[in-house]
Curated annotation (Swiss-Prot):
Biological process (GO), any one: translation
Family matches, as Pfam families: Ribosomal_L29
Gene: rpmC
Domain of life: Bacteria
Organism, as annotated: Mycolicibacterium paratuberculosis (strain ATCC BAA-968 / K-10)
Protein name as catalogued: Large ribosomal subunit protein uL29
InterPro entries per the UniProt record, alphabetical: Ribosomal_protein_uL29, Ribosomal_uL29, Ribosomal_uL29_CS, Ribosomal_uL29_sf
Taxonomy of the source species: Bacteria, Bacillati, Actinomycetota, Actinomycetes, Mycobacteriales
Family: Belongs to the universal ribosomal protein uL29 family.
Gene Ontology molecular function terms on file: structural constituent of ribosome
Length: 77
């Protein structure tokens, strides 16, 4: 999982790729929260980074849904 992916890079991905990235990020967030609860988490900042990445993916998907942005290659997804 890339750290700190930009919204521009996310906009270049297809809907399927965004959905897969969202699933991976949510799984990572779950694992980080589990590590935090058991006291094994060493990088607390990673929680915030993953949450922000999830929000960015949701934002790009919503922009496409509303027609504010198109998918990769200028096509509506």
């Amino acid at each position: 999982m890339a750290v700190g992916i930009s919204p521009g890079e996310l906009r270049e991905l297809t809907d399927d790729e965004l959905t897969e990235r969202l699933r991976e990020s949510k799984e990572e967030l779950f694992n980080l929260r589990f590590q935090m609860a058991t006291g094994q988490l060493t990088n607390n900042r990673r929680l915030r980074t993953v949450r922000q990445e999830i929000a960015r993916v949701y934002t790009v998907l919503r922009e496409r849904e509303l027609g504010l942005a198109s998918g990769p290659d200028g096509k509506e997804s």
